[in-house]
A protein has these predicted regions:
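Conserved thiamine diphosphate
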Residues: 145-195, 201, 226-239, 485, ...
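Short helix-loop-beta junction
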Residues: 62-70, 292-309, 730-738
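Flexible, low-complexity linker and terminal segments
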Residues: 1-29, 33-34, 172-427, 432, ...
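Active-site cofactor/cluster-binding pocket
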Residues: 118, 536-539, 552, 678-713, ...
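Catalytic or ion-translocation cores adjacent to nucleophile or general acid/base/metal-coordination motifs
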Residues: 144, 498-543, 734-745, 751-754
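Thiamine diphosphate
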Residues: 1-175, 201-204, 272-273, 280, ...
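Short acidic, glycine/serine/threonine-rich loops at helix termini
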Residues: 58-64, 89-92, 120-124, 149-157, ...
Length: 855
């Protein structure tokens, strides 16, 4: 019997077991907190603010979708202009009732921001944490970290920034603990009068799981304190010296006391009288450790037999000492496993130093000083399992360990034989960046944060970048010592609104020769197409640039945009977009700071709006006549568009336009070619649904699930790869199984490689890490071959274990826009996939044709 499930279940508090992703879990947590306060007869409100950025790039989208629901619960969502302004707003929320001027008993706050946003907000974090939180309010700060650097310019670990501001840090393992730790975090924040950090990694925030969302799941204990509850809260007339003393002498001890009473740290494998070896971990690494022990065939019974126990630390700073000491008592060896810099290891060594029978500790290094668990990159469960096995093998008698070490090392050996590099992200069809990032011959441009960062790997003479908001300020330091007289700086309207205008003002003050090329695409494209905070428009940007002293400002626009040109021309010279090169040539001759505002709506956002009839659809289509086309590739060179595909004929390679993917930009017609045909009043013919007959499908043999069934789904961004993972997870949930999915997010993935990791288990509690480990995939669903046969994918597969079904469609990459002869080595890629898992385990067929007939 399938469950009766609706899409609204995730936010209905009466539903216990729900399927949610990490971001949705955070939304539910705010609703749960409001519910719990009402049960305590507290009239509270919620305030959510921050700034988007992977892996917390969709927090604002999820809260915006349920704005009506949260408003009814007095939860206000207000996206910040940038991270530190948002954090300052939350500081203000804790002062709401401080002076007797509020209608509420308190405001519980939630801040979100990516690692770079944590860095730029250090000043306000320190000030607001010292000031404290309100008795019935509290603040959680969700730090979005990207340990693997999959969608960031640096590999971030934010705990040390929070530690430096003396903000306690909770590190959840999985989606369930995102909810649980949020509730615990607000309670801790109220009790101790501190902000509380919440570690949000891709493996938790971008994961989807079945969780227990009961609002009454947790029973919070408020320990007795030497001071009355509320006396550690924010107050009027406080002094810096009193704040510092209170933080060290009262608040941080209260944090540890709360953690002990509420058992935030807990045992995994239970400690017994026989236990001599202990493993400590936290957060995402805890899930990796659980999986690593599975790979060693060590379950709770085996652990008991060999004297192994484990300890999960939830509060990673400051670590609660009493629970740790009690657990560690009698242990001879402790292995500390944590990803990146070793935040816990130093604390644990300090806590256990000088204790009776002090254990030997393995952490970043072994007892001889050799590197054990690295600081850079990420830790893989297979590597963790090998390191654990090698330590255990010297201390216990377990015959199977040596064999497991040999087998696991084979998985790590570099045997992948991919014939091509992985697919890289590319500008969408019709993306304004295809035209706006072009620079004149002899000029050089800088990139920055945004989709235009991808120009770095295209033929755009673009080199170098800065952090968000620093765009162009590096030229202030480079220009006096450079032989180059002028530079071009690309900048998105989102960055301009966030903080970029300050760099432009600095450049004006320094009077350097630079042209800022600001794309106004009417959306924060990289993170999901959100509206700009404050709804700043292109006209306002032009006016602002003139007001701050930019020498010359020119507007360049796509003529399909509906602009009131009379208004714009009162502010700046306005030119069609085909004048972009000569406009840059003109401005590089001007001494001082100049600017171009390039006005063209984001292609992906146009597509979304057109589906909702919110954006006009041109009444024409462009086709290529293959009889005339000579395959010169000038159309691709002019447009940089990935919707121009090769068409192989008996007369050689021609070109065709993928009408399904085309976003109606029409810049391809600028190619010097007579083969283009423009058809007015044209609509793509759709197949009548009645004309398609579904074949009779044979019921498949369902594999037996032993622990988990691990699926890797690959394909090209924008083709429904994420949707497949979501469907599989929901189907498993409907059958009462456990399901977990981890999605690729961040930098615009249209045209780039997408990997979805999906795990299915008999019961939700059987799931640990959702990321599929090296050589641990049971099944591969390949949307196309280039990603499916990449080294990244092949490393997850294993002969005699993995079975694959792969689409044979030839999905060319962005390289084809620059190289007219580029083609994918389909046969070679297929051979490499078959060589990895065996020729009889790969089903390879063209799946795009029958599916495209249905849409």
């Amino acid at each position: 019997m399938l469950k009766n499930v609706s899409l609204d279940d995730k936010y209905k508090l009466e539903n216990k077991f729900i399927l949610v992703n990490g971001t949705q879990a955070l939304v539910r947590a705010t609703l749960i907190q409001k519910f719990r306060d009402e049960k305590e007869n507290l009239k509270t409100a919620g305030f959510v603010t921050g700034y988007r950025g992977s892996p917390v790039g969709n927090v604002d989208l999820q809260f915006s979708k349920v704005k009506k629901l949260i408003s009814e619960k007095d939860i206000k969502f207000h996206p910040g202009l940038n991270e530190d302004i948002a954090a300052t707003s939350l500081w203000g929320s804790q002062q709401a009732e401080m002076r007797g001027e509020s209608n509420y008993d308190g405001v519980f706050g939630f801040w979100y921001g990516k690692g770079p946003g944590v860095d730029r907000s250090g000043d306000v974090f320190r000030h607001s944490n010292l000031a404290g939180t309100s008795k019935n309010g509290g603040v959680i700060a969700a730090m979005g970290d990207d340990h693997s650097g999959e969608s960031s310019t640096v590999l971030f670990q934010s705990e040390y920034a929070f530690k430096d501001a003396m903000i306690p840090i909770l590190s959840p393992s999985g989606v369930q603990e995102l909810i649980d730790y949020s509730i615990l975090g607000w309670a801790l924040s109220r009790y101790a009068g501190v902000w509380v950090g919440l570690k949000c990694l891709k493996d938790t925030i971008d994961a989807t799981e079945v969780v227990d969302g009961s609002p009454d799941k947790l029973k919070i204990i408020y320990p007795e304190n030497p001071v009355k509850r509320g006396e550690l809260s924010i107050r009027v007339g406080d002094t810096p010296h009193a704040q510092e003393e209170r933080l060290h002498r009262q608040k941080l001890p209260a944090v540890k006391k709360f953690a002990l009473e509420n058992k935030i740290d807990r045992e995994g494998f239970k400690k017994t009288k026989l236990s001599k070896i202990g493993i400590i971990s936290s957060g995402k690494s805890w899930l990796d450790v659980e999986h690593a022990l599975e790979l060693l065939n060590i379950d709770s019974e085996t652990a008991k037999e060999i004297g192994l126990t484990s300890y999960k630390i939830g509060l990673v700073w400051p670590i609660e000492p009493n629970g740790l000491k009690n657990w560690a008592k009698g242990l001879k060896t402790i292995i500390i496993i944590e990803e990146k810099r070793k935040l816990m290891e130093e604390q644990i060594k300090n806590i256990l130093f000088g204790t009776e029978n002090q254990p030997q500790i393995f952490g970043e290094r072994d007892l001889q000083g050799n590197l054990l668990f690295k600081n850079e990159g990420v830790l893989e469960p297979v590597d963790i399992s090998i390191k654990i096995a090698q330590i255990l093998d010297k201390q216990i008698n377990l015959k199977s360990l040596q064999n497991r070490i040999i087998l696991l090392k084979e998985l790590l050996s570099p045997k992948s034989n991919a014939v091509v590099d992985d697919r890289t992200p590319y500008f969408c069809s019709g993306c304004p960046h295809n035209s706006s990032t072009k620079v004149p011959e002899g000029s050089r441009a800088y990139a920055g944060i945004g989709c235009h960062y991808m120009a770095l790997w295209m033929d755009r003479n673009t080199e170098g970048y800065t952090h968000m908001g620093g765009e162009g300020a590096n030229w202030i330091g480079e220009a006096p010592f450079s032989t180059r007289e002028h530079i071009i700086q690309n900048m998105g309207d989102g960055t301009y609104n966030h903080s970029g205008i300050m760099s432009i003002r600095a450049s004006v003050a320094a009077n350097v020769n630079i042209t800022y090329k600001i794309l106004y695409n009417d959306a924060v494209a990289m993170t999901g197409g959100q509206q700009h905070d404050g709804d700043i428009g292109a006209l306002e940007i032009l006016q602002e640039l003139k007001a701050i002293g930019v020498k010359k400002v020119i507007g360049v626009f796509d003529e399909k945009e509906q602009l009131n040109l009379d208004k714009f021309k009162q502010v700046a010279d306005m030119r069609p977009r085909d004048k972009i090169i000569e406009t840059q040539e003109e401005l590089r001759k001007v001494k001082g700071v100049t600017a171009i505002v390039y006005i063209q709506t984001c292609a992906a956002e146009k597509r979304r709006r057109r589906k909702k009839n919110l954006f006009p659809t041109p009444n024409k289509r462009v086709f290529i006549n293959p009889e005339v086309c000579e395959g010169c590739g000038d159309c691709g060179s002019k447009s940089n568009c990935v919707s121009i595909l090769p068409k192989e004929t008996i007369l050689g390679r021609k070109r065709q336009i993928n009408q399904s993917a085309c976003n109606l930009d029409f810049s391809c017609v600028n190619g010097f070619c007579p083969s283009f045909v423009t058809v007015s009043d044209a609509k793509i013919k759709k197949l009548e649904t009645t004309s398609f007959q579904f074949p009779k499908l044979i019921n498949p043999k369902i594999p037996t699930i032993d622990k988990t069934f691990n699926i890797v789904i690959t394909g090209v961004g924008g083709t429904g790869v994420v949707t497949i993972g979501a469907i599989l997870a929901m189907a498993s949930h409907l059958e009462g199984k456990g399901a977990g999915v981890m999605e690729m997010t961040g930098l615009a993935q249209k045209g780039g490689a997408v990997h979805i990791h999906c795990k299915i288990s008999k019961k939700p509690e059987d799931l640990n890490a959702i990321r599929v480990a090296i050589g641990d995939a049971d099944s591969l669903i390949g949307g196309e071959l280039m990603v499916s046969a990449s080294n990244k994918t092949l490393s997850l597969l294993k002969r005699d274990k993995t079975k694959a079904v792969c689409n044979s469609v030839e999905a060319n990459s962005g390289e084809f826009t620059r190289d007219r002869n580029f083609s994918l080595p389909q046969e070679g890629m297929l051979l490499s996939l078959k060589a990895k898992i065996g020729p009889d385990t790969v089903s390879y067929t063209h799946l795009t044709l029958p599916t495209s007939d249905l849409v």
